[in-house]
Amino acid sequence: MLKTQKDKKLENNFSNNNKTKKKKNIIVGLSGGVDSSLSAALLVESGWDVEGLTLWLMKGQGSCCSEGLVDAAGLCEDLGINHKIIDSREIFEREVIKKTTEGYEKGFTPLPCSMCNKNVKFEEMLNYAINKKDFTHIATGHYARIKKSSYAETLDYKSFVFKDFLLLRGTDENKDQSYFLYSLSQEVLSRLVFPLGEMKKEETRKEALRLGLRTAQKPESQDLCLVEHYGSMQRFIDKHIEPKEGEIIHVNGKVLGTHNGIHHFTIGQRKGLGIAWPEPLYVKSLDRVKNIVYVADKSDLFNREAIISKVNWVSIEEPKQEIEVEAQIRYRSHPVKGTLIPMKNSDNPANTFKLIFEESQSSVTPGQAAVFYKGEILLGGGLIN
């Protein structure tokens, strides 16, 4: 029988990791959404021995019986596979809630999804698979892809030393989630499968309907899990950080008003400042020590360079000299050309680099991730200082 385009896409996704053809046992992370549901269903349809795994992340009333957990359990029953729930509330509290709170207190704008991926989600899944012993792979519903290093040999990227496994953007440019995965290790990539990596979002909905999945018509979540749980990021912040009054000052030195905590602001913010000025003003910087919010005209928001710390090199060995990259400094932003220069010396910790943009960029925000690409290959990424 001739293979359909869908079959070829799935084959591409399922054949990039070693030993895939010999051992077919896999743990699938299930959130109760359509993407993770379809990932599990496609793996079952393709002949894998699948077990669903859902992480119980949130503390509080009703969180143990959330809609996501119920849908994930029901899906596994429909597919005839086992479903396991792991209580990950303590590690999520420590690695995501606490660190996100600390980031806001320091005047940063943290990226909770990356924290969760690095220290909770994939670690918990991998440890569970390893402890089960007979499970060799893990899978999620992320829109991203993994290739072996031989893929890079077809490209003219001679300035890089590639690792065994490469992380790539998802085929669907509008849904690509590789930005949030820059902290993954080679150990994780060697066992990881992304069933949706070659698919478009509209295809996933059609496939879910074709397979009759109970989540096929479920609306797509647009928010962080923290936002879904607390109602808004503002409520999360108010619950975890005490108000502290300070001044809002124009970069020319004029005091324009007061605020109740720098944790309520982010670089480039315009709305909600509560100040009067003839022209629109934006948050330029946050001074944690003096508890000051500095504002300026939009033209003052541009920066030509940034310091990137805690860089993790996903697909290549750490460069010892400057390299040319395409840098993405926000999830929904387009990558921009830049030069990355190592800063390893007595004044800077290891894995710290200076990123010089080819053209100045607006609202380069401390706490967010700067992720480096070469074409569709994610090279690595770190935190904007």
Swiss-Prot record:
Looking up InterPro entries in the UniProt record yields:
MnmA-like, MnmA-like_C, MnmA-like_central, MnmA-like_central_sf, Rossmann-like_a/b/a_fold
Where does the record place the region Interaction with tRNA? 175-177, 330-331
The main location is cytoplasm
* Name of the gene encoding the protein in the UniProt record: mnmA
Q: Where does ATP bind?
A: G29, L30, S31, G32, G33, V34, D35, S36, L55, G141
- GO annotations of cellular component type: cytoplasm
Q: In which domain of life is the source organism classified? A: Bacteria
Read off the Gene3D superfamilies from this record.
Adenine nucleotide alpha hydrolases-like domains, HUPs, Translation factors
Please list the reactions this protein catalyses: S-sulfanyl-L-cysteinyl-[protein] + uridine(34) in tRNA + AH2 + ATP = 2-thiouridine(34) in tRNA + L-cysteinyl-[protein] + A + AMP + diphosphate + H(+)
Q: Which UniProt keywords apply?
A: ATP-binding, Cytoplasm, Disulfide bond, Nucleotide-binding, RNA-binding, Transferase, tRNA processing, tRNA-binding
Active site as annotated: C116 (nucleophile), C225 (cysteine persulfide intermediate)
Provide the disulphide bond pattern.
Answer: C116-C225
**Which PANTHER family does the record cross-reference, listed alphabetically?**
MITOCHONDRIAL TRNA-SPECIFIC 2-THIOURIDYLASE 1, TRNA 5-METHYLAMINOMETHYL-2-THIOURIDYLATE -METHYLTRANSFERASE
Query: Hey, where's the site called Interaction with tRNA on this chain?
Result: H142, Q368
The similarity annotation says:
Belongs to the MnmA/TRMU family.
Database matches in CDD domains? MnmA_TRMU-like (cd01998)
EC main group: transferase
UniProt-recorded name of the protein: tRNA-specific 2-thiouridylase MnmA
